[in-house]
Amino acid sequence: MKTVTRWTIRIVIALIVLTVALGFWAHHFLEQSLAVLDGSTHLSGLSSSVTVERDNLGVPTIRGKSRLDIARALGFIHAQDRFFQMDLTRRRSAGELSELFGKRAVAVDKAARRNEFRVLAKNVLLRASKEERDVVEAYTEGVNAGLASLKSKPFEYSLLRLTPAPWKAEDCVLVAASMLITLQDDQNRYEQSLVTLHDTYGRKSLPFFASLITPDDAALDGSTAPGAPIPGPDVINIRDAKPVALNSLIDDGSLMPGSNSMAISGAHTTTGAAMVANDMHLEISVPGRWYRACFIWDNNRVTGVTLAGTPLIIAGSNGHVAWGFTNSCVDTADMVPIARSEQDNEYHGPGTSGILKMSRHESVILVKGSDPVKMTTDWTIWGPIIGKDSDNRPLALHWTGHMAEAFNFSLLGMEKATTADEAIEVAHQAGIPIQNILIADSAGKIAWTVAGKVPKRVGFDGRLTVPWVYGDRHWDGLLSSKETPVWSPTGVDYLWTANQRILGGEALQLLGDAGYARPARAAQIRDDLKNLVTTKPKGIVPKDLLSVQLDDRALALIKWKELLLNQIAAMDPEKGIDLDQLPEAVKTDDLRADASSTAYRLVREFKLATWNRVFTPIFAPCVEAYPEFQYRHMVSEYTLWTLVQQKPMHLLAANYLSWDDLLHQSVNDILVSLKKVHVSPKEATWGKQNTLASKHPFSALLPSLLTRSLNFPADQMSGGDDMPRIQGQTFGASERFAVSPGHEEEGIFEMPGGQSAHPLSSYYIAGHEAWVKGEPTAFLPGKTEHVLTLTTQ
């Protein structure tokens, strides 16, 4: 027995020693791929030495003699800190993820390959100006030098047992294309959904269920419209329709890629310079989406966020002008029905162009550990065939995303713009995914316009699919700078964007509709800004705009809270529904999306349950006709609230006795959902549901013990939807900043995650906690802690 015990002890000790040894080996192995922070290293191609100074958060200040040297150095540090992320981003749009992850990525690659972004990227570079091309080439050479300077390849490639492919200049365009397909739908499902609604219930259904202008809109020009009446039973009547199953996962469209931006004129700031604040709402990825940087060269200083894989400051300030973006929801795509000829590979061209032949584009997807996958896409003069309409006609996608002239690196010009007017001109030349841009200059002026390329439609508004074969409906190129709407009225005090419809009238006709966000968030920002300029007419500072960004009051739910309490009071407990604690939990606070709030969670669930029970049966025929039907983009708060208030029986599913019956079932849905997670109403805080769940791409590939240090902490988050502080489990503000140009030292910034993508780096999540808590850090880099000198020899 003693012998067995001794051997057991020896085995345990050996296992402990082996585990410790493996841990030390793994740590040492991972350390080899950490970025170089101090000392000096040669970087070929520099005209003179460049210094990279990092502060306590790892934010670099890059000092050089020329913009080309800055680009080369930026490429170097991007590669050292973020190369694997850059690689995933270029491969996402190129359709090359299967080379890393095997069969599991083939479906994603097929969808991307149809766009042929790598071919387009090469054409974009051929069209680029010499200045832009030189910057991209310098950046690319810097990336490859930075990758080569690591002692070991980035750790992700060691785990995948692969060698990283060198960076190419065209990959910078592919990174932009990946952002494009994040912000825009390369299947144009919004237009196809509108057409499906039209085909299912007729044109009379559109004003109510897909209204372009509503009474609650928060446009910059104040444009609104009376609410459309509910369609009568002659248009739509579901009372006798067969009951349908409810969706298990409710997506009401409240957490979609978007953003907030706001600007205050210099008349209301302490400095006299205008001020801009920006928080771009995206998936909270690991590592974070952005890479902070400050560039200093030849009397220029530009500070802001870069996108690893590109050489640009995307949003920030240059001392004269500050700018920020939000997704514009401008219509940049149209579906074109294809009229086939007698030959299967031929179709009728527009007007008098006659019979044209389809172009058959073949592609091969390389798959790690498996055979290559071949795919074929038919292209027309308008774009690729991506589906069929209700008459079984092929549909081609005509999209600015397939046009080389819609991509460029002209945003570089923002770095040297000195006035809002100059910045507007740069925005109109920029080839980026079409965005709202708010601009603030040091003289106090603020302005809104769109940055990027907008199609110039002739003969139609682009909302519904129309035939192009007659030649009277087409695109006449892209809008010129003179044709592109600008909003900067004399004496304007503040501006705001939150993915809402920005303008009405002729401007709306030019920009079109790709699914604007519900207006509640924009209206709340507008009203917050109005309150600021009223209470602090000449005293607004950056922290004031941060307070707007962090506004988590659920104003859009106030009426729903009252409705919920009324329904609870009217329900009969004897019917087996346990209402104990529910009223008290709903009344606990003033309805903020605070992590500790029970009221916000419960009222929100009530509204979502009602959304589900009302709209699922109404749109069931649309989903049957078009499985990817997206009513989340269409129906407004006005639509749902009007139905709940007016209670039309012809729009009530047959499995409900009355609208009150439906609302009572929605109340019961709350209780059912709480029972599933074993939480009582008084314990059902919002934070328990809204817990950050952002995971590293390798989380699904490694044991959970190893991935804990890779993923972001599972913090209970404040913030929700339909309010300025947008926050979900994996979605929210990808950064927040507020700054006045010329006064950057007073600016503030916060961002999820850190600068480095390496889990052993002290900068892996540096600054993350400040973002979670809404605590500002400085906009400019702080005191230097590390200095790396990049030398010419």
Task: Annotate each language-model stretch with its function.
Residues R10, G23-M280, V286, N299, ...:
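Substrate-recognition/specificity elements adjacent to catalytic centers across diverse enzyme folds
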Residues M1-L18:
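N-terminal Sec-pathway targeting helices
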Residues R604-G687:
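Charged, long alpha-helical assembly modules
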Residues L511-K575, L663-Q793:
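Terminal end segments
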